[in-house]
UniProtKB/Swiss-Prot annotation:
UniProt GO molecular function: glutamate racemase activity
Keyword hit for Isomerase: yes
Keyword terms of this UniProt record: Cell shape, Cell wall biogenesis/degradation, Isomerase, Peptidoglycan synthesis
Protein name in UniProt: Glutamate racemase
Family label: Belongs to the aspartate/glutamate racemases family.
UniProt xrefs under Pfam families: Asp_Glu_race (PF01177)
Pathway(s) served: Cell wall biogenesis; peptidoglycan biosynthesis
Organism: Trichormus variabilis (strain ATCC 29413 / PCC 7937) (Anabaena variabilis)
Stated role: Provides the (R)-glutamate required for cell wall biosynthesis.
Amino acid sequence: MYSSSSIEGNLYGFSEQEPQRAPIGVFDSGVGGLTVLRQIYRQLPNESVIYFGDTARLPYGIRSQAEILTFVRDILDWMQQQHVKMVVMACNTSSALALDIVREEYDFPILGVILPGAKAAVQQGKRIGVISTPATAKSNAYRQAIWEIDPNVEVWQVGCPEFVPLIEQNRIQDPYTTEVARAYLEPLIQQDIDTLVYGCTHYPLLAPVLRSLLPPQVKIIDPAVHVVTACTQELDILGLSNTHPPLPTRFAVSGCPQQFSQSGVNWLGYTPLVEAVDFTGIPVSQLQQDLA
């Protein structure tokens, strides 16, 4: 089904009698999930992590549910071969379109970012704006999650198709990115929102741009913070928290390792060593061809 440039299997050297030492798997379509990884470093410093970026098939936000399910199953099958103890879908589109389905198909816990983000948003405001990929917006996942908690909250959603490509192309400082952000935020500002949710894990990377365009009283919710808090609670409940020193984070991508490494250094503070995983026959996205 796939091949890797590294040896498959239990690279972390833990025994089956020590499940606490197994790594947490984290995946996203690209570098956006690094915002979740940074939170793991802060909140769960003893945990080892395997990070996967499906860069050959990004952006996910314009894909159908059937495509997303195929991609997610590919990744989870690979994660299972790496003997992870838990997986975090550091991708709102996957969380919206695939989480409930694949949770029933694997024997390790799988956490998504939407419910933790929705809970945090409801605690902060009553007029909530959500910026996300078009697929997440179309799914209404955030609105439904928020209304299940508090049906009296007003929710507005805006799909932002240009954000992920701009971030993956490292164009955050580009004036064009600011103008795109202004256009996406304007309808939410007109609705006098009091809270904004980053409905895509890429979007915290745009924080300086977005904050400069929002009224100062608008609170910003980063679901990455809250999904890792949920991970902490889940690990404690399952008795899977690691008390040993962590091993170095392992990075893998389906696209170009060098491109991911160059982008990742901006958010990690170090240059990650990245391996390539080839899911046989996957169609490489036009964006990935442009980045190559």
